[in-house]
Regions:
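Short, well-ordered loop/turn elements at secondary-structure boundaries
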Residues: 104-106, 119-121, 188-190
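Short acidic loop-to-beta-strand element that houses the catalytic metal-binding Asp/Glu
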Residues: 93, 104-113, 123-129
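Nuclease-adjacent, charged terminal/linker segments that flank catalytic cores
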Residues: 1-106
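Generic structural hydrophobic/aromatic packing signal, biased to beta-strands
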Residues: 63, 90-92, 109-111, 182, ...
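Acidic, metal/cofactor-coordinating or nucleic-acid-engaging core segments within structured domains
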Residues: 132-204
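Protein-protein interaction/assembly regions in multi-subunit complexes
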Residues: 114-118
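Intrinsically disordered, low-complexity regulatory regions
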Residues: 205-209
Length: 209
């Protein structure tokens, strides 16, 4: 059982002191294909570099960029959207509009299948949903970052506002509205939508029909 909430900081476990992990912490880099080399979570000039937090000793992803590791989610989505021999590429943060031309938000990743001449054959939408946090995760993060070597074994038990995954808000306030609104538009277009979540969050969701 973890005594503190930080599972990964700037892409690495907090007790990983390899040269790569140290470089990412020092320079506040993101190793998971962010749109820029640095972490930009919360604030670009003072990023909250927490990728995942512990719950019961298991890591729970709290940053959507964390899902981009090696772009495995794109491979999985393409296998769901297209035939096995399809050629495809991807675009990130694509604006979605409704029938009136009003913004319906952004699609996290659009996967596009094309033929030998580069003509579009099909596409599908991939949405990524990390888990919201209740409590205050910046306090233990800043405490750790002030002295990673000396505080990698920090004990945060008993601290006020101990950060924990908020599965209910993540599903009701974010995931369900996305499925209804964006999913409704894509359904009318007869296009598929895939949702990437991690296992702990998935296990809290009701069974879908």
């Amino acid at each position: 059982m973890a005594r503190q909430p930080l599972a990964e900081v700037f892409g690495f476990p907090i007790d990983n002191f390899s040269s790569d992990a140290t470089r990412h912490r020092t320079k506040r880099l993101c190793p998971f294909n962010n749109r820029v080399p640095n972490c930009t979570k919360d604030k670009a000039n003072d990023p909250l570099g927490v990728c995942s937090v512990y719950e019961g000793g298991n890591p729970v992803v709290t940053c959507p960029i964390r899902f981009r590791e090696k772009w495995l989610i794109a491979d999985d989505a393409a296998a769901f959207f297209f035939p096995p021999d399809a050629r495809w590429t991807s675009l990130t943060e694509v604006r979605l509009t409704d029938k009136n031309g009003h913004s319906a938000g952004n699609i996290d990743v659009i996967l596009v299948a094309y033929d030998d001449a580069g003509r579009l054959l099909d596409f599908g939408a991939l949405e990524v949903q990390s888990v919201y946090i209740s409590g205050n995760v910046r306090r233990p993060f800043e405490y750790y970052m002030a002295d990673p070597d000396g505080r990698s074994q920090l004990d945060w038990n008993g601290e006020r506002f101990y950060p924990r995954p908020d599965y209910l808000s993540s599903s009701i306030k974010r995931l369900v509205p996305q499925l209804i609104y964006k999913g409704g538009i894509l359904t009318k277009w007869h296009k598929k939508i895939a949702i990437a979540v991690d296992r702990p969050f998935f296990n809290t969701l009701p069974e879908l029909p």
